[in-house]
């Protein structure tokens, strides 16, 4: 009994520390990717094309690394992989201090940061306890979202004081996360290493066994990300509001998401499979309706209400969807499988803005992008709704 209590305490301590590390790394990512490089064209000689390329390369590096990181963690062990990641992140962001307007350094740092964050995510997802998955995944996604947003806002404020003087803060945050890592005991599901050919075959096998999940993993991210390029224009040109009122809508959505992740996500635990199915299906349908409704709304107060509803639903849909995916994963392949899943999700988030921007540009109508996003959620609702209905008798 005492050993069990000690193990539970150790697991809880490790989980909390990993949450803090995830928060700090996402904080650094938010500072650099969402704030710093976006402001560079306005305060230095860096061209917008360079910062856009850096932004894209960051997420390409993130998604590509996720695809193989689970295998690398088991082949070289967590200490080597994570330490390498921290070195890459710290060194690349440290170089920004000395070369704040170097196109090569800006792109290189974005790529290295994308690689560095990947193993932390995979370890977090594979270390979640099954009987507390909904609750703990709520905490994981909350740490991710809070880190990104607070990092972005914090860097925005520092840039207003001076555009480049506080660049050292980004590498400092990574250094703190790096130090905290040495107080964590990370354990993988198994440590059996395989030859490269066997690992490639395993990637193919993992992919084939989870084809049912790929539409949801890929298209959810694509549908949401498709709206990113048009939302500022929608706010200022269609609803005719200031950037401050638009920011308030984003904040309201973020608050709704945070509340849901912290308090509603635990509803997923110890509930029937049908309840989980209902949350996922309701989420897809509600998203379809709300996104379609945005195309007809010109009142900012109604937009704020819709933003709150989207945030609340997102905060419980993510843990529910995560729990649904977890049921398909073999217990000894968690790192590899979560890595592949994260990679597919990353590619969805990359192609979404591309489609969203192209649809608006070639049709010259913002509403068509809303219709496109809503249609994706309709397709997901029909596809997975059919699966849930077919498997409802098996659900317990």
Curated annotation (Swiss-Prot):
PROSITE patterns according to UniProt? MFS (PS50850)
Keyword Transport listed:
yes
**What membrane topology was assigned to this protein in its record?**
Multi-pass membrane protein
* A GO CC term attached to the entry: plasma membrane
Q: By its UniProt entry, which InterPro entries does this protein fall under?
A: ATG22/LtaA_families (IPR050495), MFS (IPR011701), MFS_dom (IPR020846), MFS_trans_sf (IPR036259)
Annotated Gene Ontology MF terms? antiporter activity
Q: Where are the membrane-spanning stretches?
A: 15-34, 46-73, 80-99, 105-126, 138-159, 165-184, 211-231, 243-264, 276-298, 304-326, 338-358, 370-390
Which UniProt keyword terms apply here?
Antiport, Cell membrane, Lipid transport, Membrane, Transmembrane, Transmembrane helix, Transport, Virulence
Pathway the protein contributes to:
Cell wall biogenesis; lipoteichoic acid biosynthesis
Per the record, the GO terms for biological process are: lipid transport; lipoteichoic acid biosynthetic process
The subcellular location is: Cell membrane
Q: Which family, according to UniProt?
A: Belongs to the major facilitator superfamily. LtaA family.
Function field: Proton-coupled antiporter flippase that catalyzes the translocation, from the inner to the outer leaflet of the cell membrane, of the lipid-linked disaccharide (anchor-LLD) that anchors lipoteichoic acids (LTA) to the cell membrane.
* NCBIfam families linked to this entry: MFS_flip_LtaA
> Could you tell me which PANTHER family the record lists for this protein?
AUTOPHAGY-RELATED PROTEIN 22
Q: What is this protein called?
A: Proton-coupled antiporter flippase LtaA
- Lineage of the organism: Bacteria, Bacillati, Bacillota, Bacilli, Bacillales
Coding gene?
A: ltaA
